[in-house]
C-alpha cells in the first residue's frame, strides 16, 4: 500500500481481541456520552453519577436546572442593575465592582447551565427553556414590575444592539 512517502515501520493493524486486552482496553471502562438527545431519568447532569438512576434525584436536577435558568434571566435583567443603583450613587467604585461581580456570577451560572445542557437529556433541555421563559416573564416582560420598568427593559435589551 502506498503511504505517500511515510513509512509505518512495518506496523500491522491490531488483532481483533487486542483492544480488549490492553492499549485501547482502558476505554472499555469509560462511560458513554450521548451526542444526541435522549429521554429518561438515568443520566448524569453536571457531576459524576448525579442524578444517576434515582428518580427523586433526577427531579432535583431538573429543579436545579430550572432555577439556574431563572437566575440567568434575573441577573441579565435591569432589575439586577436597579438593586445596585443606590450603591453606585453613594460609591461609584464600589458600585462598579458590584456590577462586575454580578456580571461574573451571571456568566458563571450561564456556563454552568450550558454544561448541564451538554448532558443531552431532553428533560434537562425542556426545563432550561422553561426556566428562561419563566425568568423572562418574571423579570423582563412585566410580571414583576410596573409598565415603566418594562419600557426601560425594552430600551436596554441586550439583544438589541
From Swiss-Prot:
The chain crosses the membrane at residues 55-75, 109-129. It is a multi-pass membrane protein. Its main location: membrane. Keywords: Cell membrane, Copper, Copper transport, Ion transport, Membrane, Plant defense, Transmembrane, Transmembrane helix, Transport. GO terms for molecular function: copper ion transmembrane transporter activity; sugar transmembrane transporter activity. Disruption phenotype: Reduced copper transport ability, increase in copper content of the xylem, and enhanced resistance against X.oryzae pv. oryzae (Xoo) PXO99. GO terms for biological process: copper ion transport; defense response. One of its GO terms (cellular component) is plasma membrane. It is found in: Cell membrane. Belongs to the copper transporter (Ctr) (TC 1.A.56) family. SLC31A subfamily. PANTHER family: COPPER TRANSPORTER 3, SOLUTE CARRIER FAMILY 31 COPPER TRANSPORTERS. Involved in the transport of copper, in cooperation with SWEET11 and COPT2. Contributes to the removal of copper (Cu) from xylem, and thus to the sensitivity toward bacterial pathogens such as X.oryzae pv. oryzae (Xoo). Self-interacts. Interacts with SWEET11 and COPT2. This is Copper transporter 1. It comes from Oryza sativa subsp. japonica (Rice).
Amino acid at each position: 500500500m502506498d503511504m505517500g512517502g511515510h513509512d509505518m515501520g512495518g506496523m500491522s493493524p491490531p488483532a481483533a481481541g487486542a483492544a480488549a486486552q490492553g492499549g485501547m482496553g482502558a476505554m472499555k471502562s469509560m462511560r458513554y456520552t450521548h451526542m444526541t438527545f435522549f429521554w429518561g431519568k438515568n443520566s448524569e447532569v453536571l457531576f459524576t453519577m448525579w442524578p444517576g438512576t434515582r428518580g427523586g434525584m433526577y427531579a432535583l436536577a431538573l429543579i436545579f436546572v430550572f432555577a439556574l435558568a431563572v437566575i440567568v434571566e434575573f441577573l441579565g435583567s435591569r432589575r439586577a442593575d436597579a438593586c445596585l443603583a443606590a450603591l453606585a450613587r453613594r460609591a461609584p467604585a464600589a458600585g462598579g465592582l458590584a456590577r462586575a461581580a454580578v456580571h461574573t456570577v451571571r456568566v458563571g451560572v450561564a456556563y454552568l447551565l450550558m454544561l448541564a445542557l451538554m448532558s443531552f437529556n431532553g428533560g434537562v433541555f425542556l426545563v432550561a427553556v422553561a426556566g428562561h421563559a419563566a425568568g423572562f416573564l418574571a423579570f423582563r416582560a412585566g410580571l414583576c414590575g410596573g409598565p415603566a420598568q418594562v419600557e426601560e427593559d425594552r430600551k436596554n435589551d441586550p439583544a438589541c444592539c
